[in-house]
From Swiss-Prot:
Beta toxins bind voltage-independently at site-4 of sodium channels (Nav) and shift the voltage of activation toward more negative potentials thereby affecting sodium channel activation and promoting spontaneous and repetitive firing. One of its GO terms (biological process) is defense response. This is Toxin Cll7. The keyword Disulfide bond applies. CDD domains: neurotoxins_LC_scorpion (cd23106). It is found in: Secreted. Belongs to the long (4 C-C) scorpion toxin superfamily. Sodium channel inhibitor family. Beta subfamily. Keywords: Disulfide bond, Ion channel impairing toxin, Neurotoxin, Secreted, Signal, Toxin, Voltage-gated sodium channel impairing toxin. Expressed by the venom gland. It comes from Centruroides limpidus (Mexican scorpion). SUPFAM superfamilies: Scorpion toxin-like. Has the structural arrangement of an alpha-helix connected to antiparallel beta-sheets by disulfide bonds (CS-alpha/beta). Pfam families: Toxin_3. Residues 1-19 form the signal peptide.
Length: 85
């Protein structure tokens, strides 16, 4: 019984540690979602939760999300340069 409990706890911890995170990106332009109020930011929290991420905040003037769904892209996108040639 104790072994089963330990295995379950390890699997939960493993999923938490390896969750995807990164900057929220506009897939059309390739640009990060811009924010101005650094730290906890309602705009970033709402935008990150809308795509299924667990939490979001403003970091480096971009919305940074934790707990991204694996099927959602993060910034930078491979073939998008956000307006740069």
């Amino acid at each position: 019984m104790n072994s089963l409990l330990m295995i379950t706890a390890c699997l939960v911890l493993f999923g938490t540690v390896w969750a995807k995170e990164g900057y929220l990106v506009n897939t059309y332009t390739g640009c990060k979602y811009i924010c101005w109020k650094l730290g906890e930011n309602k705009y970033c929290i709402d935008e990150c939760k809308e795509i299924g991420a667990g939490y979001g905040y403003c970091y480096g003037f971009g919305c940074y999300c934790e707990g991204f769904p694996e099927n959602k892209p993060t910034w930078p996108l491979p073939n998008k340069t956000c307006g740069r040639k």
